[in-house]
Amino acid sequence: MGSGFYAQLRSLLLANGCVLVRQGKGIHEIWRNAISGKNFPLAVTVQSRHTANGILKDAGVA
């Protein structure tokens, strides 16, 4: 799997109704918020908490 914050982000996203849509290019995955229908990318190598917070914001979770 990834390193850094990936496992925590994945758990939070799944707990909040987000689903993995497909594998993106390289180290990215494309996820969808089931409530809003919005797609967003998630890198499997998230090292910064600021990046992790930005992903949660894009996902509509934070």
Regions found by a protein language model. Give the residues of each.
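Basic nucleic-acid-binding interfaces
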Residues: 1-25, 32-62
